[in-house]
Amino acid sequence: MAESKNNKKRCSFCGRSENEVGFLITGMNGYICDSCATQAYEITQEAMGAGKQSAGATRLNLKELPKPVEIKNFLDQYVIGQDDAKRFLAVSVYNHYKRLLQKDSGDDVEIEKSNIIMVGSTGTGKTLLARTIAKLLHVPFTIVDATVLTEAGYVGEDIESILTRLLQVADYNVPEAEQGIVFIDEIDKIARKGDNPSITRDVSGEGVQQGLLKLLEGSVVNVPPQGGRKHPDQKMIPVNTKNILFICGGAFDGIEKKIAQRLNTHVVGYNASRKTATIDKNNMMQYIAPQDLKSFGLIPEIIGRLPVLTYLNPLDRNALRAILTEPKNSIIKQYIKLFEMDGVKLTFQPEVYEYIVDKAVEYKLGARGLRSIVETIMMDVMFEIPSEDQKEYEVTLDYAKHQLEKANLARLQTA
């Protein structure tokens, strides 16, 4: 308690005695005078007002909403190829946020949410596309791995943990989080294991799909603020998922067989040979349809709540070569920037680029593998250069080969 030697009560903030102020408010371990209480109230109101203003400043504006062509052009700066997927994403994202900003016209026409599912091999750019769109729109964005999700009551993460991560990214600003984007990766890993029910519980398959339904369709979900399992003493935060855009991605390994079976069934009969001749058997993914996802193991309710289905082409050698150097944030440009920060000009022999791409193709690593290869090549020089008085450094083909031969290539193959 703030008391003087003569037992006079004093304000714990300004130190004035009870005779020098209008009145004192008694707390558990001290006092506060009327003047300090007024100042504290004004400071609190000012801080809360600034918070609301900053939160409102990040909200989307229909006039500032980028058009589909502008969205695609922005994606082109960071992602090589995949034009079809970019067009699907650009239109879907534009319509989604236009739907959020629509005014009540009173005509009873309600535009439904268009969640997206992207199908493509590992390293083709699914995650990068979603992340780049969130960067353009300046909305909260989070990535969730579907493989760690389990039904409530089992070891693993609850479905609600998806929204916990989005809230954390938005600094617990609920209105802002409710306009965010969630990317659910490896959605194919929660496919139903088979058509026949098993005596063992499929806690990370169909049960998780059922749990995702309420998030995808739009409902108010009580979210534990710190994640983890719910318990009675934990205060929940209600989050409305109606305006959250969900983008799902998965490799769907083996789905080409499902597509081929469907196409073979459909082309049997009159004029079948002509139709079969037009099918590109090297890229069956381009013919994917919702029924193929159902055959793979996604339940119809989930497929219905992911109405926008697009695919990503496998990356050929030319695409990998472009990805290595052309995007704004390409791995080569990142290393050049890192060396610049140490005052060193970094260059590569042109043959090094071709060698890196050859290895990525050889080990079937995709675009993600390019980084693994470059980091393996550059590790030693990145360790030594900051301690040396050197202004220029050129990576030669011989040096690149030596570094990769010295490394454990089997480790790269599973990167």
Curated annotation (Swiss-Prot):
Family the entry assigns: Belongs to the ClpX chaperone family.
Taxon lineage: Bacteria, Pseudomonadati, Bacteroidota, Bacteroidia, Bacteroidales
GO molecular function: ATP binding; ATP hydrolysis activity; ATP-dependent protein folding chaperone; protein dimerization activity; unfolded protein binding; zinc ion binding
Positions with a binding annotation for Zn(2+): 11, 14, 33, 36
A Gene Ontology term for the protein's cellular component: HslUV protease complex
GO biological process, one term: proteolysis involved in protein catabolic process
Gene: clpX
Subunit structure comment from the entry: Component of the ClpX-ClpP complex. Forms a hexameric ring that, in the presence of ATP, binds to fourteen ClpP subunits assembled into a disk-like structure with a central cavity, resembling the structure of eukaryotic proteasomes.
Organism, as annotated: Bacteroides fragilis (strain ATCC 25285 / DSM 2151 / CCUG 4856 / JCM 11019 / LMG 10263 / NCTC 9343 / Onslow / VPI 2553 / EN-2)
Binding residues annotated for ATP, in chain numbering: 121-128
Name of the protein in its database record: ATP-dependent Clp protease ATP-binding subunit ClpX
